[in-house]
UniProtKB/Swiss-Prot annotation:
Belongs to the GST superfamily. Nu-class GSH transferase family. This is Disulfide-bond oxidoreductase YfcG. Residues 90-215 form the GST C-terminal domain. It comes from Escherichia coli (strain K12). The reductase activity of YfcG is unique in that no sulfhydryl groups in the protein appear to be covalently involved in the redox chemistry. Glutathionylspermidine (GspSH) binds YfcG about 10 times more tightly than GSH. Moreover, GSSG binds 100 times more tightly than GSH and 10 times more tightly than the GSH analog, GSO(3-).
C-alpha cells in the first residue's frame, strides 16, 4: 500500500496517473494547501520542503521499513524502477525518457507555474512578468511540439514517466492562454493520453478529493 499525500495540482496529478496506470494499491490523502496543511509537523516529516506530492510506500522493494519520498520527479522514477513500468530498459529510450522527465521538472513545470501565478494569482498586474512567462510558455510548447512531431511519445516508442510528468501541465493549457491548435502534435498527444482509461480514473479520484483506498 502506498499513501499519496496529494492536492489537485499538476504535480499531484502526475502521481495519480502513474498509480492508476500501474494498478497499484494506494490511499489518497488530501493536503489542504489553502489551510496550511503542508506546514503540519506530520507532513513535514515526510516532505520537509512542504510541497506536494509525497508518498509513503509501506511495501518497499527492499522489504524494509516504510519509505517516504517527496519531489514528483523522484517519486515517478522510484515507482517506475520499483514496478518495471513506464521506463524502458533499452539504453537510448531510457536516456531519452529521463531527459524529458528532467526537462519537465526543471523547465516546463516551473515556467508554466509562473505563467499561472502572474495571470491568475498575483496581487497586482505586472505586464512585464506576464509577457515574459507567456513568451517562455510558448517557447516550451514549441519545443514539445517539435519532439512529438518526430516521436509518438516523449521517450520514444512507448508511453513513459516523461509523458506522465508533462501531461498534467499541458492539460491546463487554457489557463496558460495557449491555443493548443497551434501545436498539433502536442494536441494529438494530449488527446491520446486523455483517452487512456487510467487517466480518467486518476482525474475522477482527484475530483472526489477524499481519503480512499484503491483495492
Amino acid at each position: 500500500m502506498i499513501d499519496l499525500y496529494f492536492a489537485p495540482t499538476p504535480n499531484g496529478h502526475k502521481i495519480t496517473l502513474f498509480l492508476e496506470e500501474a494498478e497499484l494499491d494506494y490511499r489518497l490523502i488530501k493536503v489542504d494547501l489553502g489551510k496550511g496543511g503542508q506546514f503540519r509537523p506530520e507532513f513535514l516529516r515526510i516532505s520537509p520542503n512542504n510541497k506536494i506530492p509525497a508518498i509513503v510506500d509501506h511495501s518497499p522493494a527492499d522489504g524494509g521499513e516504510p519509505l517516504s519520498l517527496f519531489e514528483s520527479g523522484a517519486i515517478l522514477l522510484y515507482l517506475a524502477e520499483k514496478t518495471g513500468l513506464f521506463l524502458s530498459h533499452e539504453t537510448r529510450e531510457r536516456a531519452a525518457t529521463l531527459q524529458w522527465l528532467f526537462w519537465q521538472v526543471g523547465g516546463l513545470g516551473p515556467m508554466l507555474g509562473q505563467n499561472h501565478h502572474f495571470n491568475h494569482a498575483a496581487p497586482q498586474t505586472i505586464p512585464y512578468a506576464i509577457e515574459r512567462y507567456q513568451v517562455e510558455t510558448q517557447r516550451l510548447y514549441h519545443v514539445l511540439n517539435k519532439r512529438l512531431e518526430n516521436s509518438p511519445w516523449l521517450g520514444g516508442e512507448n508511453y513513459s514517466i516523461a509523458d506522465i510528468a508533462c501531461w498534467p501541465w499541458v492539460n491546463a493549457w487554457t489557463r496558460q492562454r495557449i491555443d493548443l491548435a497551434m501545436y498539433p502534435a502536442v494536441k494529438n498527444w494530449h488527446e491520446r493520453i486523455r483517452s487512456r482509461p487510467a487517466t480518467g480514473q486518476a482525474l475522477l479520484k482527484a475530483q472526489l478529493g477524499d481519503e480512499r483506498s484503491d483495492s
